[in-house]
Amino acid sequence: MTYVVGLTGGIGSGKSTVADLFAELGVSVIDADVVARQVVEKGSPLLAEIAEHFGEEILLADGSLNRTALREKVFADESQKQWLNQLLHPAIRREMLKQLAVQRAPYCLFVVPLLIENKLTALCQRILVVDVSEQTQLERANRRDNNQLALIKNIMQSQVSRAERLKYADDVINNDEDLARNLPQLKQKVLDLHHLYLQFAEIFNER
């Protein structure tokens, strides 16, 4: 069985950057955001169900999902968000577990933004949190998502607080610094954790 490190953090924390650095070291990465896109690909049964529920306006001209339109609908309405989560989360979980079952690497990274909120910590042997201040979250996500500040604040409110997330952490990467300046230090931190996780994985797999 593969040793599982759960990687999580709030919106704008830099989870994807950290996951990419692990991937560069040859670590297998199972990313919930990637899986979430796969399960609603154009022509999929789930996408058809979503379009039937919310209307054709959540589709782009080519028939694929308009993620921005869908996000705006669900984050403005708690009941709609719950409906979507009840549809998607089981499908995403099933697909991630399917990918995990075929892993043969010493350890893999389980990248899940809502790892704590969706009670997926039990699937992990260790939890790594990418931590930034709320101000950094807002600034980064606002730059990335073209000034959708109200939407970003809604997303942050739907996630556990920074303090709550850190309670679950076995390891923490502080990612508040500007990435361009901090990349060498970030790479070193990831490399150090990689060696640590290989040691833990060896012990885990000997049991």
Swiss-Prot record:
Can you tell me which residues bind ATP?
A: G12, S13, G14, K15, S16, T17
Q: Which UniProt keywords apply?
A: ATP-binding, Coenzyme A biosynthesis, Cytoplasm, Kinase, Nucleotide-binding, Transferase
Q: Which PROSITE patterns match?
A: DPCK
**Superkingdom of this protein's organism:** Bacteria
Which residues belong to any copy of the DPCK domain? 4-204
| InterPro entries per the UniProt record, alphabetical | Depp_CoAkinase (IPR001977), P-loop_NTPase (IPR027417)
Role description: Catalyzes the phosphorylation of the 3'-hydroxyl group of dephosphocoenzyme A to form coenzyme A.
| Stated family | Belongs to the CoaE family.
Q: What is this protein called?
A: Dephospho-CoA kinase
The encoding gene is coaE
